[in-house]
Amino acid sequence: MPAEYNDHGISFAYPENWHLEENKIESGNLVIHLSSPGGAFWMVTINDRPIASSELAKTTLEAIRTEYDRVDHSPVKRVIGKYELSGYEINFFFLDLINTALILSFCVDGRTFCIYWQSDDRQLDICEDVFEAITYTLLDRLSK
């Protein structure tokens, strides 16, 4: 049975064995972070001010590039339901493992959302489907 998050005007389903944390950061943005038992994670940052979603994705990418030495990235665009999301797919080494991450940003009702997920390649086949399902439930429920 999946767990449910329903607060701050958003809701989504996620695996019940994943840990959820919610934080307000200095900028006033809300960050909801889900972590799997194996270390993979999915998070969404919600900015209540409308900013260009492409700029938010670039800022997130730059933060990653300053944290890790070799970061390969390529732009991505996805359409999920009625939403167009843009961002980057990222690959980098961390603790001798190849990690894959995805940044997707979009705007809805004057708020800008940035979804970020990350997994090492040992878990990617399993976790990527879970990340997609969490993202889908978030977007599907924003439509209603």
Segments from the language model and where they lie:
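Hydrophobic residues embedded in beta-strands of well-ordered beta-sheets
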Residues: 30, 112-113
